[in-house]
């Protein structure tokens, strides 16, 4: 099909307002992406002009397309490898970006490459040495290749034209567990900032991100383009997101969760349950499975192949519930999610913002329910101050969660399921009851 003359393509806002190449417009149209979002309108023209960019916009606003489209348009004008590097904090987000770039670039012979932990280093090194056009990576694994895989493998990075730091606030955050040393290793293998185009995207413009605006620049480079469109710095929780809390006794939190998932309003909703710890997520998945919920999980104790498989099952609605740690709180776009439950109240209000951002995306409606114990009140108050909105007490007509918990043997049923799940973990069995070696955390 000739995209330049396709009537549907002519009507696409990316062509009429942003001067995006016809082949890209046709690809976006095929994906049912016809109207650019605010962050895309602001950033795409400036990136095409060659300007460095700091783009701030809340979750679900289309930041990936905002950098992927200009990268692919510039690459098509001068296709060589390695043209661009995209760094992002989690494997799941890297996979999602890889799949989006692969889909958008389908009409061309563009080769993206995914570089993340949990997979074979040697096969990755071979693929990296073959000069893919766009590398999408987590900083830790790409830094490993830079440090250990040899000059022949990583020399292509020295010609990179564009680099993206996606979820830049997380990548640049200092402190324990910081990714910043690995990010610096990655950037040191690329051309200097004066010879490349640097794009930063985030839902939260932190001081570390803002500071990059005023860094010294080469004389031949225009000023950094900075846009902040309804970011989550100013409490911009989508108006379509309903925030509620449910008071729970600490000793019966699991029973309240089971009943909450089973109410008439919630029993069919695709839901993500967030926990603060991997052990909690592992236990909850096993327990909920015994209580006949269609459930899977996503956390760092799982092998990468299982993480990918579980996420694919949830996307395909083979599982209705995803139990996850904050590894799933950033960037993942699963449009069907209409319910987010905070089983544990996050310690950091920013983590709350990213968690609830998994629902009510792109104008859709969603609900976030936070289970609140007596010790969680101060955390909830800090969250409300951060998002500049009060949570409402959860309610459903004709439903008393507490009443259902104390009646009908729910406490006994949930208690037995929890004990069986704990025993399974102690015996070293997987969620299907099969004996296997003790899971180890992998980078």
Swiss-Prot record:
Motif DEAD box: positions: 166-169
Motif Q motif per record, residues: 13-41
Entry's Gene Ontology BP terms: rRNA processing
Gene Ontology CC terms, in alphabetical order: cytosol; nucleolus
Principal localisation: nucleus
Subcellular location: Nucleus, Nucleolus
Keywords, comma-separated and alphabetical: ATP-binding, Helicase, Hydrolase, Nucleotide-binding, Nucleus, Ribosome biogenesis, RNA-binding, rRNA processing
PROSITE patterns named in the record: DEAD_ATP_HELICASE (PS00039), HELICASE_ATP_BIND_1 (PS51192), HELICASE_CTER (PS51194), Q_MOTIF (PS51195)
Disulfide-linked positions: none
Binding site residues for ATP: 57-64
Helicase C-terminal domain sequence ranges: 240-402
Family annotation (CDD domains): DEADc_DDX49 (cd17955), SF2_C_DEAD (cd18787)
Top-level EC class as recorded in UniProt: hydrolase
Catalytic activity, as annotated: ATP + H2O = ADP + phosphate + H(+)
Function: ATP-binding RNA helicase involved in 40S ribosomal subunit biogenesis and is required for the normal formation of 18S rRNAs through pre-rRNA processing at A0, A1 and A2 sites. Required for vegetative growth.
Annotated domain remarks: The Q motif is unique to and characteristic of the DEAD box family of RNA helicases and controls ATP binding and hydrolysis.
Protein name, UniProt field: ATP-dependent RNA helicase dbp8
Biological source species: Aspergillus oryzae (strain ATCC 42149 / RIB 40)
Taxonomic placement: Eukaryota, Fungi, Dikarya, Ascomycota, Pezizomycotina
């Amino acid at each position: 099909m000739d995209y330049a003359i396709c009537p549907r393509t002519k009507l696409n806002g990316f062509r009429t307002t942003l001067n995006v190449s016809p082949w890209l417009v046709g690809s976006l149209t095929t994906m049912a992406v016809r109207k650019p979002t605010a962050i895309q309108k602001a950033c795409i023209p400036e990136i095409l002009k060659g300007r460095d960019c700091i783009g701030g916009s809340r979750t679900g606003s289309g930041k990936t397309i905002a950098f992927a489209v200009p990268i692919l348009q510039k690459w098509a004008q001068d296709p060589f490898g390695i043209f661009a590097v995209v760094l992002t904090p989690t494997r799941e987000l890297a996979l999602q970006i890889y799949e989006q770039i692969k889909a958008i670039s389908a009409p061309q012979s563009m080769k993206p490459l995914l570089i993340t932990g949990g997979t074979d280093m040697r096969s990755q090194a071979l693929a990296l040495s073959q000069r893919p056009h766009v590398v999408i990576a987590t900083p830790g694994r790409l830094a490993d290749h830079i440090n250990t895989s040899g000059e022949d493998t990583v020399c292509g990075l020295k010609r990179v034209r564009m680099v993206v730091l996606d979820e830049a606030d997380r990548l640049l955050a200092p402190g324990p567990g910081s990714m910043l040393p690995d990010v610096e290793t990655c950037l040191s293998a690329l051309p200097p900032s004066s010879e490349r185009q640097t794009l930063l995207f985030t839902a939260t413009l932190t001081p570390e991100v803002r500071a990059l605006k005023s860094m010294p620049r080469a004389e031949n480079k225009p000023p950094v383009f900075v846009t902040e469109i309804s970011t989550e710095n100013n409490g911009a929780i989508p108006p379509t997101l309903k925030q509620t809390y449910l008071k729970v006794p600490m000793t019966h939190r699991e029973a309240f969760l089971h009943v909450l998932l089973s109410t008439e309003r919630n029993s069919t909703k695709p839901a993500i349950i967030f926990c603060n710890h991997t052990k909690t997520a592992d236990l909850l998945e096993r327990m909920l499975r015994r209580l006949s919920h269609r459930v899977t999980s996503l956390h760092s104790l799982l092998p990468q192949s299982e993480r990918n498989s579980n996420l694919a099952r949830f996307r395909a609605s083979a599982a209705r519930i995803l139990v996850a740690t904050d590894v799933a709180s950033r960037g993942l776009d699963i449009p069907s999610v209409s319910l987010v439950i905070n089983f544990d109240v996050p310690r950091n209000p920013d983590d709350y913002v990213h968690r609830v951002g998994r629902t009510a995306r792109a104008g859709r409606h969603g609900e976030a329910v936070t289970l609140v114990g007596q010790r969680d009140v101060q955390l909830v108050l800090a969250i409300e101050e951060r998002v500049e909105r009060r949570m409402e007490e959860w309610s459903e007509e004709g439903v008393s969660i507490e009443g259902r918990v104390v009646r009908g043997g729910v406490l006994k049923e949930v208690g037995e399921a929890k004990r069986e799940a704990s025993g399974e973990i102690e015996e070293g069995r997987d969620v299907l009851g099969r004996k296997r070696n003790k899971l180890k955390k992998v980078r």
